[in-house]
């Protein structure tokens, strides 16, 4: 694309994998702007958490922004990453410089003022789009991600700005709800507190605000875009989303994964390997067994690399664990999450010493080695907007055993690159596992599936082109969805 056609796009996000992340949102927020930079000038706005401020990357203050309602004044700094990606940091120590995650303290308790913290992020994005940040760069389109950035399109609309916006739903279940009593401190107009606006069963919903006031809504897979218009997956917003879909304002664009996920070159692996070099893959398996204190074995090794939350269907994995062990399999589990889920994983490992191992926490190096060393990846998610682990696993020759939902349905070919099951039941899960055991017993079938999985085209090009088309269409119209605000 010629320089004259390059447009200025601001990503608004609460996570960026280079600096701070809790899940896939951080990965996407870091990878997609880089994948698009040959087409557009894409920059990122993120809060100034300690992990950002203390990252070792120089930050140059470029502007100051005043307060609004209960939202405090703040500064905007510019951080230039080594590869050229420009990050704008929203500096407000009273809101962001706290120990813990972007959303919770060190004990896992959500910050009580999250509505203030992320409303300030949304307002800063609107101020950026209005040219109020003293910078030579002003976005022509704002692309906001998930509920923490949900008020970015909303403030833009309430302030009468015509800059188009996109809101991407990464997980509809996390909605950012707060009492309607907070409307005054957030500067929300009464006219926005309606079923067509951000009102949600007597509360205010940040994610609904993003969807209500953005020019267009995207989700991270085509199947999930359809699913969220149904009661099973719509989280109470299915009617609202069906209305958006009917107007052509909802679409699904799949995530990709970056080129570092290559078994032949990944610097994290114990042993590199290529398709058909399965003895070299087994060296990674030996490492995983040692790390998780599993017995030496020639049976299949199943991996769980996951947030430990109800969504991920871990209770179903507990329900099939004995079946896996009785058939000669082993399970290695890594992740962190809800305390009760973490304890359930510890109890599972205690039930099957040497056959099931668990490490509470997350380490990307070990996660990569688990994908490389395992034969199968377990992903019995109740819903999965996109999912990245199943793509990582396939790149490393680990075949997913997963529920047929969301992005899993879009990225796993049943019986070709993995095994899908339809119902969130132990019975349905077990049937898929039995198919996996049957394939494992026939090395020629197993290796053929591994080769096909490793060749699957999970690059960012599949996302870049649809987003580029959407950006072009919105910028051409340069109008937002009709509204009275």
UniProtKB/Swiss-Prot annotation:
| Gene3D superfamilies referenced in this protein's UniProt entry, alphabetically | Glycogen Phosphorylase B
The record's top EC class is: transferase
Q: Which of this chain's residues are annotated to bind ADP-alpha-D-glucose? A: 21
- State which Enzyme Commission number(s) the record gives: 2.4.1.21
What keywords does the record list, in alphabetical order? Glycogen biosynthesis, Glycosyltransferase, Transferase
Which InterPro entries does the record cross-reference, listed alphabetically? Answer: Glyco_trans_1 (IPR001296), GS/SS (IPR011835), Starch_synth_cat_dom (IPR013534)
- Catalytic activity reported: [(1->4)-alpha-D-glucosyl](n) + ADP-alpha-D-glucose = [(1->4)-alpha-D-glucosyl](n+1) + ADP + H(+)
Q: Which GO terms describe its molecular function?
A: alpha-1,4-glucan glucosyltransferase (ADP-glucose donor) activity; alpha-1,4-glucan glucosyltransferase (UDP-glucose donor) activity
Name any Gene Ontology BP term.
glycogen biosynthetic process
Report the domain of life of the source organism.
Bacteria
Recorded metabolic or biological pathway in which this protein acts: Glycan biosynthesis; glycogen biosynthesis
**Signal sequence, renumbered to the chain:** none
The protein's matches in Pfam families, at most eight in alphabetical order, are given as: Glyco_transf_5, Glycos_transf_1
Function, in words: Synthesizes alpha-1,4-glucan chains using ADP-glucose.
Query: What family is reported?
Result: Belongs to the glycosyltransferase 1 family. Bacterial/plant glycogen synthase subfamily.
HAMAP family linked: Glycogen_synth
Q: What is this protein called?
A: Glycogen synthase
